Amino acid sequence: MKKLMMMAVAAVCALPTMAESGDSLVFETIIANPVTSIKNQNNSGTCWCYSSLAFLESEAMKKNPKIKDLDLCESFVVNKTYIDRADRNVRTHGDASFSQGGSFYDVIYCMANYGLIPEGNMPYPNTLYGDSLFNFTSFFPPMEAYIKAIAKSDAKKINPMWKKDVQGMIDNYFGKCPETFKYEGKIYTPQTFVKDYLKLDPNDYVSLTSYTHHPFYSSFILEIQDNWRWGSSYNLPLDELMRVMDEAVKNGWTFAWGADVSEEGFSRRTGKNRCVATVPDTKSNAGVGSDQSKWTGEKAGAKISVADGAGEKTITQEMRQLGYDNWTTTDDHGMQIYGIAKDQNGKEYFMMKNSWGEYGPYKGFWYVSKPYAAYKTMNIVINKNAVPKDIRKKLGI
């Protein structure tokens, strides 16, 4: 995969909403669970981190009503993840990929093994270089090239100093990760912050997906490049995965949502109903792409004139599988699903929080049709207590 307290946001989202006079969809909120403020990953492939932390912020607020606002530090997680990924890349002689992207599991792994910290205990994104948002244009390519040179070296023995060099590059950009910090008058380590303040248990979180090339109700390593830690997902039939998503939100939960956003129906800047994702029942000529950097222009969604909540395809398990098998469904982007709304025709949509800043007519929030979610969801990470009991029993969780 290449984030106002919700009480304020919900007051806006709960009203029927029309982006502007040319748009045809009007949304009314059915339920909007608490989320934190919209963030901006800017020019970086860190959606996996922003979306996972957005999800964990909601989790912490749900578990601890005294927490009224929360902003977890992306730089801490990315710092820890990139050095681990560099190590894996070198150990596999470059066969395990190294890129800006990542998976939800990277954040769960970081929480379990290194902890988490609140924003403000490391330099804010890119402030060390005179900016206020991530911009990996100058930072990442030299580091990537250095790691590749080590991993693909024909030397019989490599100098272990390479790892200190890479950690230095990472620290120079993000700042060093603190061993202790003060928050709301108390001293924490990253690990005690998770346990004592956030009160989150990494073992509560599971990844769910739906594909037929592995048995249902088993777990498997989802075969995507950014799953470099080889995290496992539980495999459900499509109707049960959709039931988990729907019932979780209606019962007060949110979840991290990984999906393909390269579809023409994922409407961005132009045309009707921008920031709405649908599966229009028409032939698509969308190009392949991923994440914000390729979608801030007018190409994506420009040809859509039927994203009006009607005429969507009926999604089957076979369609999902075909998209995955032939690469038309790709691991593009991580987001957070937090609510359900309906349009003026009574059709339901998931409400999604993005990490592209206050972008579009809904200021960083999107509406995702259920057919789109059924078709293009790669996986979700969710609190296992949000999964219906009968499905948990089938999965053994």
Segments predicted by a language model, with ranges:
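Bacterial Sec-dependent N-terminal signal peptides
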Residues: M1-G22
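Short, glycine/serine-rich, charged loops/turns that create anion-binding
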Residues: A11, A54, V261-S262
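Hydrophobic alpha-helical segments
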Residues: P16-T17, E59, K272, N383
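Active-site nucleophile-adjacent alpha helix/oxyanion-hole segment immediately C-terminal to the catalytic cysteine
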Residues: G22-A256, G360-Y362
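Active-site signature of cysteine proteases
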Residues: K164-I397
